[in-house]
Design a protein with these regions (language model features):
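Glycine-rich phosphate-binding/hydrolytic loop that grips phosphoryl groups
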Residues: 103-134
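Adenine-nucleotide phosphate-binding core of ATP-dependent small-molecule kinases
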Residues: 24-74, 109
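C-terminal, charged interaction/regulatory segments at domain termini
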Residues: 53, 70-78, 114, 126, ...
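Predominant activation on well-ordered alpha-helical scaffold segments within soluble catalytic domains
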Residues: 60, 64, 92, 113-121
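Acidic-glycine-rich active-site phosphate/pyrophosphate-binding loop
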Residues: 29-39, 85-98
Length: 134
């Protein structure tokens, strides 16, 4: 894919672009602004990687934010996006910074469909028990 041949160095603004010194909890290579350095001359491969990075960062940060009000430290990622080759680079960084653990189970790309099927079966069983004719 295009994204596999891209670089974020000319797309995302990193902490190192703002200061030469690491900030507490923010290493120099962490993204400060997604697409913060992109311009009209950016390579298509870099833009593709920037989009993939943005999507995965948003998913990861959304999951982290959703876990903040509870004791959730383990986050399971499922669906086709888990097959993107950029996942092993992005989620471990979030784990280090946010004190959570992301788990991508085997066959993660099928887990959404399996969950929908189980929900359908369980709901149907529930209706059969409590509604009689449903």
């Amino acid at each position: 894919s295009l994204a596999e041949h891209g670089s974020l160095n000319d797309i995302d603004l990193h902490i190192r672009d703002i200061t030469p010194h690491p900030l507490p909890g923010l290493p120099l290579d962490v993204t400060a602004s997604i697409f913060g350095k992109a311009d009209a001359n950016a390579k298509v491969e870099d833009i593709a990687l920037g989009i993939v990075h943005m999507v995965l960062q948003t998913i990861g940060q959304g999951a982290v934010f959703a876990s903040l009000n509870g004791d959730i430290k383990n986050i399971v990622l499922i669906g086709n996006l888990t097959r993107l080759p950029q996942c092993p680079d992005i989620f471990p960084r979030l784990e280090d910074m946010c004190d959570v653990h992301f788990k991508i189970p085997e066959y993660a790309e099928y887990r959404t469909a399996i969950g929908a099927a189980l929900c359908y079966i369980r709901n149907r069983e529930y209706k059969d028990i409590f509604c009689g004719k449903c």
